[in-house]
UniProtKB/Swiss-Prot annotation:
Pfam families assigned: FlbT
Protein encoded by which gene: flbT2
GO BP terms: bacterial-type flagellum organization; mRNA catabolic process; negative regulation of bacterial-type flagellum assembly
GO molecular function: mRNA 5'-UTR binding
Keywords assigned: Bacterial flagellum biogenesis, Repressor, RNA-binding
Protein name: Probable flagellum biosynthesis repressor protein FlbT 2
Organism of provenance: Bradyrhizobium diazoefficiens (strain JCM 10833 / BCRC 13528 / IAM 13628 / NBRC 14792 / USDA 110)
Family: Belongs to the FlbT family.
Function, as annotated: Has a post-transcriptional repressor function in flagellum biogenesis. Associates with the 5'-UTR of fljK mRNA and promotes its degradation.
Length: 136
């Protein structure tokens, strides 16, 4: 896999952080866990249940030598999501995500979680619009 990076951009590879000082292309010739700087979510951006799940899996990917705590947190958060979710699309996605995480395919799990962000937003928007307005 070939990755192009801009000057000053960072990439996280197997827990290591690399920053390049000029435009460069990197070819990854074996299986590695990596995350581009633009795909990294800050803790302050984990404002919904799916974004929190993304952040947890991101921690597992960024620190592959110490996933025990993040894995336990993932298990709790994933189970809570499955317990309250009523959307078939969301449930199917959560099952697929769990399989990917179980196989330590964190990057693919992050992609799958990102794909569910619009579904979550639609669900949240629907819930917000169904709340009856009460006059004071």
């Amino acid at each position: 896999m070939k990755i192009s990076l801009r000057a000053g951009e960072r990439i996280y590879i197997n827990g290591a952080v690399l920053r390049v000082d000029r435009k460069v292309s990197v070819e990854l010739v074996n299986d590695v866990m990596f995350l581009l700087e633009g795909q990294i979510m800050q803790a302050s951006d984990a404002t919904t249940a799916m974004r929190q799940l993304y952040f947890i899996v991101q921690l597992m990917l960024m620190n592959p030598t110490d996933v025990r705590d993040a894995s336990a947190l993932y298990g709790q958060h994933h189970a809570a999501l499955v317990a309250v979710c009523e959307s078939r699309e969301m449930l199917d996605g959560l099952v697929a995500i769990d399989e990917l995480v179980g196989a330590t395919r964190y990057f693919e799990a992050l992609k799958r979680i990102r794909a569910l962000f619009p579904v979550e937003q639609a669900i949240l928007a629907g819930v917000a619009t169904d709340i009856p307005f009460e006059a004071a």
